[in-house]
Amino acid sequence: MSLLCYNRGCGQRYDPEGNSDDSCTYHPGVPVFHDALKGWSCCKRRTTDFSDFLSIVGCTKGQHNNEKPPEPVKPEVKITSDKKELADFKPKFNELIIQAPKPIECINRPSSDEPMAKLQLKISASLKQALDKLKLSENDKTVTDESGEIKIGTSCKNGGCLKTFAGPQSNEEVCHYHSGVPIFHEGMKYWSCCRRKTSDFNTFLSLEGCTKGTHLWTKKDDGKKVVPCRHDWHQTGAGVTISIYAKNSMPELSYVEANSTVVNIQVVFEGEKTFQQNVQLWGVIDVAKSYVSLTATKVEVFLKKAEFMTWARLELPQKAPAPSEQNETPEEQE
């Protein structure tokens, strides 16, 4: 009877009688997610694509392991008797909440239909070096050889499938994969197409696919694709900075255009990924004194405030649509 190996990066089924010291290729480390990069603590290889991360070949050989790692136990929060006694001594009274006055919005707010102007791009030396290295290593990232044939050992690109190409017979196998995307939320890990959730990353990797199909050995080139990207903002009295954590952005394809109250952002990074964002600004900016800084790890959009003041938020809240007025004729009263 075959058993399932729970070593990180393996997930294969094996025969216990043939389990030797070099049967399993796995990762002894732990998964590391940092600045949109994914990898293992025991390896130096990093990638931004989750399916590529799952297909990273292990760096250590050993025996297969069929022992499922225990899931972390969440500590229970208990209320002691001392806390209950202290709560009884608290004075009971009605709290009076005083709210600060709402900020006064500008009366003469410029129209959002004003002409847009592209902001100045400032390219850092670190980004130039990173782009030069990427151009030199483009040939090393191809999966197929010059004849167009799939190489032995190529991993299936379907999410959740850990099979590798072993020859023409691999094309006849049924691929069990996840058609959705991985979701990490509040310590839980799962696929959007399944309801099975776990807090252990190793268990998440071994979740069997919920969809049957054929293996995908090479990715289809769909050109530029719009993807989400982590971003945030902070402010000083003089300006607002929007940070977009996109690595290796391409200056010739990326731009930011703005007028006094609207900003349109397009960042092309990692060769084929595009981040787009339209922001209706809460305040008013000086377009001529605003600019964009491109570095190897992120893009920073500096917006010079037209007035030295604190913004309540970055975006102007959308006004709720007014309810349709009903034309009713009042009844005549005698």
From Swiss-Prot:
It holds the Pfam family CHORD. InterPro entries: CHORD_dom, CHRD1, CS_dom, HSP20-like_chaperone. GO terms for molecular function: metal ion binding. Residues 226-315 form the CS domain. Keywords: Metal-binding, Repeat, Zinc. Residues 5-64, 156-215 form the CHORD domain. SUPFAM superfamilies: HSP20-like chaperones. This is Cysteine and histidine-rich domain-containing protein 1. It comes from Xenopus laevis.
